[in-house]
UniProtKB/Swiss-Prot annotation:
The lineage of its organism: Eukaryota, Fungi, Dikarya, Ascomycota, Saccharomycotina. Its EC number is 2.4.1.142. This is Chitobiosyldiphosphodolichol beta-mannosyltransferase. Pfam families: Glyco_trans_1_4. It comes from Yarrowia lipolytica (strain CLIB 122 / E 150) (Yeast). Keywords: Endoplasmic reticulum, Glycosyltransferase, Membrane, Transferase, Transmembrane, Transmembrane helix.
Length: 463
């Protein structure tokens, strides 16, 4: 057979594969009339540790509370909260975690991992095909968005895909590689090409929604900002509850403390988008100050790849009136530790400038004010001198600590603002903003996108 014959044959086979898959699965994709009164079903997918994906857990909880059956998919790891584990409408599907047990070179392992992830995701989604909705976290973008697009085109065309944008995946890759690197450019193209055709795009800030229009050319009518809000278990503690926390963790986190101590809390995953040198240098300034300042107990929760580096830096500081403790907490204990603090700290430096730190939302839920490193979108959450203080660099952070702990009126003022924030709960926001997208309730006023400058003349997406 001539060479061009082989070429034509291969092209025909390549094009025939999705057509065959479509024909084979189309009959399973149609909803019989007898199923009209059945509960709606939503797949909630995150290619990450379920227990460390609070926003997706909150989505699953809200959907189940509204009567949806939920297939919750992600890695096994940290334990989700009990209302997820004990809910009969939520079924958890663990995605196998792929580890480099054979010590392969980074590039080789990365390629094999992505290939394996494609197969695992397609197999799982094929098993769950026919759902009414598929709610997906982004990032990670690769291979999630490509697989989801394939699923929606060929395996379950009736499913409405909702992407929940927590950040831009390509900007996270750009923390390790130059923005001009071919891999970063490919990741940006991949994210826009496969992510741009969802039924609806949720995003964590208004600024991110505007960037999605500008960067990826998305239709503004399909972008719905959903600010993170504290879930039900993040709430202010009474004075007696705070004393219970201090007593329960006296041997580990609150040892050798006096009544004069002020407690600062921060949480982290010890990754490059958080610069802990800012906090450590700020604490050093506080420690060296000549002012009459109270001693500090700084509690840092979490774990991650850069933790050993952080602990080594703490050892070298030799602070006198500042002491630091670290801990990895159970899900139920985390809100209690937050609620017992006088002040929260966020060191999150957004890779894109458009996302918001979930830890600040959690802290506000517990009614504690926050000092946060400033960046573009932060003002949508932290209002300086109202519910916290936004700072640039360690000098401003150190001076803020000194100002707040030497002037009770300033600390009390932002404490009041944080207590007001604690009343804005996830449940209230979700039902009003997102519920109608899943046929839960209806918009009683304007559509959510009409609150923002997202209008666009571009045509709507396919699905």
């Amino acid at each position: 057979m001539k060479a061009w014959h082989w070429s034509v044959t291969l092209v025909v086979i390549y094009l025939a594969i999705p057509v065959i898959l479509y024909l084979l699965t189309r009959k399973d994709d149609r909803k019989p009339l007898s199923d009209i009164r059945k509960r709606k079903r939503t797949i909630v997918l995150v290619l990450g540790d379920l227990g460390r994906s609070p926003r997706m857990l909150y989505h699953a909880r809200s959907l189940a509370r509204s009567g949806h059956k939920v297939d919750l998919c992600g890695y096994d790891g940290a334990k989700p909260f009990d209302e997820i584990l004990n809910n009969d409408l939520i079924k958890i599907h663990h995605i196998p975690l792929i580890l480099n047990t054979r010590k392969l070179p980074f590039v080789v392992f990365g390629i094999l991992k992505v290939i394996r992830q494609h197969w695992l995701l397609i197999s799982l989604l094929y098993k769950l095909r026919g759902a009414d909705y598929l709610l997906v976290q982004n990032p990670p973008s690769i291979p999630t968005l490509g697989v989801v697009r394939f699923y929606n085109l060929f395996l379950s065309t009736r499913t409405k895909v909702v992407l929940d944008w927590h950040n831009f995946g390509y900007t996270i890759l750009a923390l390790k590689l130059p923005e001009t690197h071919p891999m970063v450019k490919f990741a940006k193209f991949y994210e826009g090409f496969f992510g741009g055709r969802a039924f609806v795009h949720l995003c964590v800030t208004v600024l991110m929604g505007q960037a999605m229009r500008k960067t990826f050319g998305m239709s503004g009518r399909r972008i719905v900002p959903l600010h993170d809000r504290p879930a039900f278990h993040f709430k202010p503690l009474s004075e007696s509850e705070k004393l219970d926390v201090l007593r329960d963790f006296k041997e580990t986190l609150y040892d050798d403390m006096t009544a004069d101590h002020k407690i600062i809390v921060s949480s982290t995953s010890y990754t490059p988008d958080e610069n802990f040198n800012i906090l450590l240098d700020a604490l050093a300034l506080y420690d060296e100050s000549k002012l009459d300042l109270p001693p500090l107990r700084v509690i840092i929760t979490g774990k991650g790849p850069m933790m050993p580096e952080f602990l080594a830096k703490v050892e070298k500081l030799q602070l006198k009136r500042v002491s630091i403790r670290t801990a990895w907490l159970e899900f139920a204990d985390y809100p209690r530790i937050l609620g017992a603090a006088h002040l929260g700290v966020s060191l999150h430096e957004s890779s894109s400038g458009y996302d918001l730190p979930m830890k600040v939302v959690d802290m506000f839920g517990c009614g504690i004010p926050v000092v946060s490193v400033d960046y573009a979108a932060l003002s949508e959450l932290v209002k300086t001198n109202t519910n916290g203080v936004a700072v640039k660099g360690h000098v401003e952070m150190g001076n803020t600590f000194m100002s707040l702990f030497s002037n009770r009126g300033k600390l009390d003022n932002i404490k009041r603002g944080a207590m007001i924030e604690s009343r804005n709960t996830w449940d209230q926001t979700w039902v009003k903003t997102v519920g109608p997208l899943f046929d839960i309730g209806e918009y009683v006023q304007q559509r959510p996108d009409e609150d923002y400058d997202f209008s666009s003349s571009s045509s709507d997406d396919d699905h």
